[in-house]
């Protein structure tokens, strides 16, 4: 779904083409943290500085106001990705358990008739669990989904930088959701995919390979943030970490080591 603020969001998030091949190389000191589903996750020696990996990008619609609908074709994503009867892992239910019946948005909500879709990161100051605005909107906020093993080193609310290595586009991001252990490493929101120039359809979009993720552990406050805050914090953290040159070197070095 393209929001009316899509053009502005693209301008805010896209820092332009990054010429990785032309960047001067740094010596990259790194530590292998783990490997999951074929993706090796690395850290710089002081892991508070950065965790990075190269992977694919699957599209997550969770938190978007029109993510899921009782009539499956009307939702941004297939209802099967929100769960099934007795196990609704991505929807608010009447008993606030996965076993309950999904709650529909009302007339005063952003998308009446659509289900209330959740994210692992949410606004705790809003005590109304049935309010769709409590969660991180995938259509508006550039967020990444962390694999459970990554959450051993980083936490929800931390900032990140994500790069499309094929076209050089980069985007700031926040960690706002958690994947299941059996799912591949590498998932992001609709808004983040748009900023990277990737097909953002949760049903048919995404990208196989050539996406670099850099997460800054301990950088967030465990709360959702506005786009402007995400951009400003991630930009400063990326520059402090070493920027394009260091990421280029670390990706090349990690690729060589992973193939040994």
Per-range role (PLM):
Residues 1-6:
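Positively charged n-region of N-terminal signal peptides that target proteins for export
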Residues 11-20:
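Hydrophobic h-region of N-terminal signal peptides that target proteins for export
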Residues 20-169, 195-200, 216-255:
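Cell wall/extracellular polymer interaction/catalysis modules
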Residues 143, 174, 212-214:
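Soluble periplasmic/extracytoplasmic beta-strand elements of cell-envelope proteins
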Residues 166-172, 209-210:
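Loop/turn elements at helix/coil->beta-strand transitions in domains of secreted/extracellular proteins
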Residues 171-180:
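Short beta-strand-centered aromatic/proline hotspots
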Residues 181-192:
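Short, solvent-exposed secondary-structure boundary/capping segments
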Residues 204-208:
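Intrinsically disordered, low-complexity linker and terminal regions at domain boundaries
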């Amino acid at each position: 779904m393209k929001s009316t603020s899509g053009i502005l969001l693209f301008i805010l998030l896209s820092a332009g083409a990054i010429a990785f091949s032309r960047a001067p190389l740094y010596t990259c000191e790194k530590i292998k943290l783990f490997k999951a589903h074929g993706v090796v996750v690395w850290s710089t020696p002081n892991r508070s500085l950065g965790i990075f990996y190269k992977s694919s990008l699957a599209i997550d619609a969770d938190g978007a106001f029109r993510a899921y609908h009782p009539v499956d074709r009307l939702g941004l994503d297939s209802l099967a990705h929100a769960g099934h009867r007795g196990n609704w892992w991505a929807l608010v239910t009447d008993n606030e358990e996965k076993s309950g019946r999904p709650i529909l948005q009302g007339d005063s909500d952003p998308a009446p008739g659509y289900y209330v879709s959740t994210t692992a990161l949410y606004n705790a100051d809003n005590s109304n669990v049935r309010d769709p605005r409590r969660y991180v909107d995938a259509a508006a906020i550039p967020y990444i989904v962390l694999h459970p093993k990554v959450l051993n080193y980083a936490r929800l609310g931390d900032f990140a930088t994500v790069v499309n290595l094929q076209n050089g586009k980069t985007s700031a991001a926040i960690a706002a959701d958690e994947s299941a252990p059996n799912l591949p490493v590498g998932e992001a929101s609709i808004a983040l995919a748009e900023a990277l120039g990737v097909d953002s359809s949760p049903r048919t979009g995404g990208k196989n390979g050539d996406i670099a993720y850099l997460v800054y552990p301990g950088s967030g406050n465990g709360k959702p943030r506005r786009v402007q805050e995400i951009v400003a914090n991630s930009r400063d953290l990326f520059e402090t970490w070493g920027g394009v040159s260091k990421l280029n070197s670390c990706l090349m070095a990690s690729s060589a080591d992973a193939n040994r």
